[in-house]
A protein has these predicted regions:
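Acidic/His-rich, divalent-metal-binding segments that scaffold phosphate/diphosphate chemistry
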Residues: 1-104
Length: 104
C-alpha cells in the first residue's frame, strides 16, 4: 500500500489551501477557510477510504484524492471545451463540487 511522507501530507494540505485561496472569494472563501482550518488536524491525515483495497486508503489519502479529483475535473472540462461542448458552470462551481464530492 502506498504511504505518504509527512512532507507530502503537509505539501498536499498547503496545495489544497492554495487552491481554495486562488479559486474562491468573498463569503465562500471565508467560510471554506474557516471550515478547513477548523478540521485541518483531522482532514490532513484522513484516508480517502477506510477499506485498504480502495483508493487512497492511507494517512493523508483524503486530501491527495481531493487534489486528484479537482485536477481531473479541470482537465475533463478543458477537453469538453476543445470538443465544442457548452459549459454552463464556472471553474469555481466545478472545483467546489470536486472538492466536496465525498462529503455527506
Amino acid at each position: 500500500m502506498k504511504q505518504l511522507t509527512e512532507k507530502q501530507i503537509v505539501d498536499n494540505w498547503n496545495k489544497l489551501m492554495q487552491l481554495i485561496e486562488n479559486t474562491f472569494e468573498g463569503d465562500r472563501l471565508k467560510k471554506l477557510k474557516t471550515m478547513y482550518t477548523y478540521f485541518e488536524d483531522r482532514m490532513s491525515i484522513a484516508p480517502a477510504s477506510g477499506k485498504a483495497a480502495y483508493h487512497n486508503a492511507m494517512v493523508g489519502g483524503y486530501v491527495e484524492h481531493v487534489l486528484h479529483v479537482t485536477d481531473c475535473a479541470l482537465k475533463i472540462k478543458k477537453l469538453w471545451e476543445e470538443d465544442g461542448a457548452m459549459i454552463n458552470f464556472t471553474d469555481e462551481e466545478l472545483i467546489f463540487a470536486a472538492m466536496h464530492h465525498d462529503l455527506g
